[in-house]
């Protein structure tokens, strides 16, 4: 079969034209669309990678912040626990201290009450013993004992030292030779004369002689008229006598013994009770009666 070259060439040209047309109007738009789509997908993937990277950064940042917050929370919880423990310990210490102070105050109050009670009981016992002693001695007192007490007073008057002698002489001069005699029982005339004879030696104008020194207790026939006796009965003296002149007093009686005994006991007792009570020494003992305005000469005990 013979070849028709015109037809072959025409078909070749048609084929090439078809290829160009397909490429121009079909393949090229498809390829461009594929390229555009590929670029778009690549952009989307790039954006996704960027977002993923940002997300990773955010996650890392948030995890760091969470770790920091957890650390701060742990620190704050620890500080809160420490502060709570310190506050609790402080409250316990304060409560313990307050309780100890209350106990100490209560113990001190109880000791004070006990000391005051002891003081009251002992002072009451002292006064009761003193009152009983006075009562017993008062009941046992008689005339003979009273006479002996006066004799003892006269004997003591004759044995005064120089200072007491001078003080008694000044007291007589200041009183105008007026003497107040206080005793539990009335004085007999002989006893009055005996006292006057003894006191006469203390007159400024009196001159001692040997006859007067040898008859101290004898009742003189002519008592010194310059001395005036004023007698006063004082039952509290029990047995004894007090001579008062010019603000000066000379006493010799059983009541003096009892009073001195009471003073000695209280003098020993008061410092002890004041120590228990926490008082300074001599506190509460200052009173006007402790130092009377007149001078008192206490004759030493036999």
From Swiss-Prot:
The keyword Transmembrane applies. The keyword Transmembrane applies. The chain crosses the membrane at residues 5-22. It is found in: Cell inner membrane. GO terms for cellular component: plasma membrane; proton-transporting ATP synthase complex. GO terms for molecular function: proton-transporting ATP synthase activity, rotational mechanism; proton-transporting ATPase activity, rotational mechanism. Residues 278-302 are annotated as: Disordered. It is a single-pass membrane protein. CDD domains: ATP-synt_Fo_b (cd06503). Keywords: ATP synthesis, Cell inner membrane, Cell membrane, CF(0), Hydrogen ion transport, Ion transport, Membrane, Transmembrane, Transmembrane helix, Transport. InterPro entries: Alt_ATP_synth_F0_bsu, ATP_synth_b/b'su_bac/chlpt, ATP_synth_F0_bsu_bac, ATP_synthase_B_chain. F(1)F(0) ATP synthase produces ATP from ADP in the presence of a proton or sodium gradient. F-type ATPases consist of two structural domains, F(1) containing the extramembraneous catalytic core and F(0) containing the membrane proton channel, linked together by a central stalk and a peripheral stalk. During catalysis, ATP synthesis in the catalytic domain of F(1) is coupled via a rotary mechanism of the central stalk subunits to proton translocation. Component of the F(0) channel, it forms part of the peripheral stalk, linking F(1) to F(0). F-type ATPases have 2 components, F(1) - the catalytic core - and F(0) - the membrane proton channel. F(1) has five subunits: alpha(3), beta(3), gamma(1), delta(1), epsilon(1). F(0) has three main subunits: a(1), b(2) and c(10-14). The alpha and beta chains form an alternating ring which encloses part of the gamma chain. F(1) is attached to F(0) by a central stalk formed by the gamma and epsilon chains, while a peripheral stalk is formed by the delta and b chains. Belongs to the ATPase B chain family. This is ATP synthase subunit b 1. It comes from Pseudoalteromonas atlantica (strain T6c / ATCC BAA-1087). The gene is atpF1.
């Amino acid at each position: 079969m013979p070849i028709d070259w015109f037809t072959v060439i025409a078909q070749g040209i048609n084929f090439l034209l078809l290829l160009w047309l397909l490429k121009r109007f079909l393949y090229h738009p498809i390829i461009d669309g594929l390229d555009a789509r590929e670029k778009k997908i690549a952009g989307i993937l790039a954006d996704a990678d960027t977002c993923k990277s940002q997300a990773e950064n955010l996650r890392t940042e948030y995890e760091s912040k969470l770790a920091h917050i957890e650390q701060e929370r742990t620190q704050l919880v620890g500080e809160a626990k420490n502060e709570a423990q310190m506050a609790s310990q402080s409250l316990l210490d304060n409560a313990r201290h307050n309780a100890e102070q209350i106990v100490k105050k209560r113990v001190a109050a109880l000791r004070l009450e006990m000391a005051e009670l002891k003081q009251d009981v002992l002072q009451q016992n002292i006064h009761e013993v003193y009152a009983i002693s006075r009562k017993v001695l008062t009941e046992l007192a008689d005339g003979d004992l009273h006479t002996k007490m006066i004799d003892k007073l006269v004997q003591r008057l004759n044995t005064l030292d120089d200072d007491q002698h001078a003080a008694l002489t000044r007291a007589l001069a200041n009183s105008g030779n007026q003497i107040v005699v206080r005793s539990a029982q009335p004085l007999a005339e002989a006893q009055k004369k005996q006292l006057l004879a003894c006191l006469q030696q203390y007159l400024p104008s009196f001159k001692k002689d040997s006859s007067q020194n040898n008859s101290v207790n004898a009742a003189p026939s002519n008592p010194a008229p310059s001395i005036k006796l004023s007698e006063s009965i004082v039952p509290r003296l029990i047995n004894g006598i007090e001579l008062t002149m010019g603000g000066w007093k000379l006493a010799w009686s059983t009541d003096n013994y009892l009073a001195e005994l009471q003073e000695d006991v209280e003098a020993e007792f008061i410092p002890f009770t004041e120590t228990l009570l926490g008082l300074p020494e001599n506190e509460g003992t200052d009173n006007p009666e402790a130092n009377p305005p007149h001078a008192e000469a206490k004759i030493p005990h036999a």
